[in-house]
Amino acid sequence: DEAGQDILSALLNAADRGVDIRVIVDGISGFMDVQHNPWFLALDAHKNAQVRIYNPVNFLKPWDMQARLHDKYLIIDDQMYTLGGRNTTNLFLGDYSKGKNIDKELFVYETDPGKNMQNTSMSQLQTYFDSIWDSSDSKPCRGSRNGKKTVEKTEALKKHYKELQKKYPAAYEKQNWEELTFETNKITLLSNPIESENKEPWMWYSLHRLMMSGKQATIYTPYIICGREMYDDLSQLTDNNVSVEIITNDVAKGANPWGCTDYLNEKEKIWRTGVKVYEYMAPHSCHTKAVLIDDRMSIVGSYNLDMRSTYLDTELMLAVDSTELNAIIRKEAEHDKTFSKTMENGKYTYGENYKTKELSTGKKLFYATLRQIIKPLRRFL
């Protein structure tokens, strides 16, 4: 789509300038959008660019398809990177789509690249990427790199890049990144295992342990799909006097039908853990994945509070020790809570900006049917 072409044109331009480009794409996304696609092959054909597919689709091993690459990040040299939960499609980038998902990522800038980098989040992320890239699960992109369509798309991407420069000149001006960022006490990368198989829940272990160390935790997640162990862990938090609140999409606004349907089935179990759930109703669906602990710790990345992110997918989160960042995200959370409803003492209470949206008859029937279908499939949603 248009957002994807924006990204590919920028990557191709960088390759033309001699930048070494490596792109790794999830297997199912690769099967649907990348393999044999002349737009991606135009990039992969460049001498300075490579595209690989993590866990490519193999119909002889359908059970392997469940393990997906869910990380989203961009590393530039040894100096800067951005990491979060945003996908590179019209729904997440630009102004191409009426329906949008609001997301959050962090930009990290190293002021002294190349020195004392051993224990930095930059070195941790570079090591993580290399391990994924060199994994036996990652394969080259398939397709003809010398075909007529590939050559045509190469020229189209070069032309498109020039059009973007004219349309958005401010985006191409040199920036003083140090002035645009602020210092933190520490940044640590959290991850799941990378093998394309059922995973030990490293990410959830880490998040739960960090929340247990605090007095209050706020969780942002687009949807909630918990298994028994995760329910037990949430109950353990509240039993130990950790105040936990979750901000998630109202069913009438959520963009993921599986997550919305599971919430209709499971919301009473969630409430019984003692957490307070804010069902967020805003102009756009929220895709943010973050955890705030007390007034110092902010954790942002790709992890959803669901069983897929916990047991199946690769995931990355940045744990940032910074009162300044925590205050920024907490201010956003307080604002979002005014657009939410929450269950208290058996009754819903409504934030001052919450506006009820009724589900259409068609959607009610759809969810009623789906509520029965998904019960045995919850782990894989």
Predicted regions and their residues:
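Long, K/E/R/D-enriched contiguous segments that form extended
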Residues: 205-252
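HKD-type phospholipase D/PLD-like phosphodiesterase module
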Residues: 2-212, 249-294, 303-310, 314-316
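Structural motif
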Residues: 82, 218-220, 299
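Alpha-helix capping/termination and helix-coil
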Residues: 214, 218, 238-241, 245, ...
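Long, C-terminal catalytic modules of enzymes
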Residues: 282-284, 288, 293-381
